[in-house]
Regions:
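Alpha-helical recognition segments enriched in aromatics with Gly/Pro capping
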Residues: 1-98
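Helix-rich, typically C-terminal accessory recognition domains appended to large enzymatic cores
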Residues: 28, 45-46, 78-220
Length: 220
């Protein structure tokens, strides 16, 4: 029927993502087929997925379902061209809980764009390859706390609170390092790794071009 080795490696899948309409469509079909295969002793599991997460929907700026007739359609290609793919990716993550519905908000997009600009400038302005990482207990405390919290939020699919955590981290580092940079440089590699899942393109450029690493941040 199928490679036992491959089935043991890949199945059952850890998580199924989709809209609520999948509950009576693809999810239902896959569960039915899996149970049939189980009854024939062709697989040794009864459920194809170990978990299920519904995603929400994004409506037009007017709070209504996007429609050409309503004139409220937001062209994703146009937004990416204007603000960048990382901005849109982080904006969608920041809108709120993953399973809720939201109206598209242009001011929210601009807010995320400004944050990414601040993040980029912070890493550039406080990077000095001749200096060692500042051994500052306050900075280390903030960084370690953020790594733990944001990492857990990503695992729990609380992407919006993860972005909020990054914003709080940048605000805290701005205050601790100061505009004159007297605290030398902070562990930029750590904060670039933290932002990489949300802004992969910017993180890669900072990682390689500014911080001088030779391999991708996404391989770390």
């Amino acid at each position: 029927f199928a490679s036992q080795e491959n089935m043991a490696k890949w199945l059952p899948l850890p998580l199924y993502f989709g809209g609520s309409e999948h509950n009576t469509m693809h999810l239902l079909y896959s569960r039915f087929i899996t149970k049939a295969l189980r009854s024939l002793n062709l697989v040794d599991f009864s459920e194809p997925f170990l978990g299920r997460r519904n995603h929400g929907f994004i409506f037009g700026p007017d709070g209504q379902k996007m429609s050409k007739s309503r004139g409220n359609v937001v062209d994703p290609d146009e937004q990416v061209s204007k603000y960048g793919a990382d901005t849109m990716r982080m904006y969608f993550a920041f809108m709120g809980p993953y399973d809720q519905n939201y109206a598209f908000n242009f001011d929210g997009v601009l807010g995320v764009r400004r944050f990414l600009d601040r993040f980029w400038n912070f890493v550039q302005n406080h990077t000095n390859k001749k200096l060692k990482i500042a051994d500052n207990p306050k900075i280390n405390l903030v960084l370690n706390k953020s790594v733990k919290e944001i990492g857990e939020q990503i695992k729990q699919h609380k992407f919006n609170t993860g972005v909020s955590g990054l914003m709080k981290l940048l605000n805290a580092l701005d205050k601790l390092v100061g505009s004159d940079g007297k605290l030398e440089t902070v562990n930029h590699e750590m904060i670039v790794k933290l932002i990489a899942p949300y802004a992969p393109h910017m993180a890669e450029e900072l990682w390689m071009e500014v911080l001088g690493n030779k391999t991708s941040v996404h391989l770390e």
